[in-house]
Swiss-Prot record:
Keywords: Cytoplasm, DNA-binding, Transcription, Transcription regulation. This is Probable transcriptional regulatory protein Rsph17029_2308. It comes from Cereibacter sphaeroides (strain ATCC 17029 / ATH 2.4.9) (Rhodobacter sphaeroides). GO terms for biological process: regulation of DNA-templated transcription. The keyword DNA-binding applies. GO terms for molecular function: DNA binding. One of its GO terms (cellular component) is cytosol.
Amino acid sequence: MAGHSKWANIQHRKGKQDKLRSKMFSKLAKEITVAAKMGDPDPDKNPRLRLAVKAAKAVSMPKDVIERAIKKSQGGDAEDYSEIRYEGYGPNGIAIIVETMTDNVNRTASNVRSYFTKYGGNLGTTGSVSFMFDRVGEITYKPEAGDADTVMMAAIEAGADDVESDEEGHWIYCGDTSLNEVSEALEKVLGESEEAKLVWKPQNRTNVDLETAQKLMKLIDALEEDDDVQTVTGNFDIPEDVAAKLDA
């Protein structure tokens, strides 16, 4: 689940990251191959590839797997993927954005629609919910990078627009076209970030109750387990008391 949300914490505590690790590697490798195919195979000369490689390293993807994904882009047998965004509403009207990378658009569209229908949602048209989100760059640092004031000052100097800090880390937001520039400026002051990526940031988040959270988790699990789905983002947050019950 993309974005700074309690969802990520629940996902971690429930061990979902381990369960999805092989799928995560596969999806990241696909992004690396596509990024390298669309631009230069050298990450230093290809901003999208640089971010993809950084994301792969953040989840400890082996170096040889990363190199193999880049090499695959230069071969004549590299698949052609279409990048399609789907938008809709989940249970209780929660807005959901699903980003996919597929070699069969009909298959993916059918699958995504079926997940929404099965788990109490409704797939809409492109633009039906994205107006409730901002497309921004998100740079993540661990708490050890500094206190909130230190990170805030560094972010302002680097040209960032917003910072969210708590005991689990710092999330720095910037314009989608300035992600690489801001990320590089921050590295000079705070060191290398944990992650830097483009995200759909909700303009407002809705706190959900236990029943809604359970329904949302089923929908998001189904989407994230689909090989064609790269990211899933929603405009909701799960309060700590609800999260504790989900973990029980």
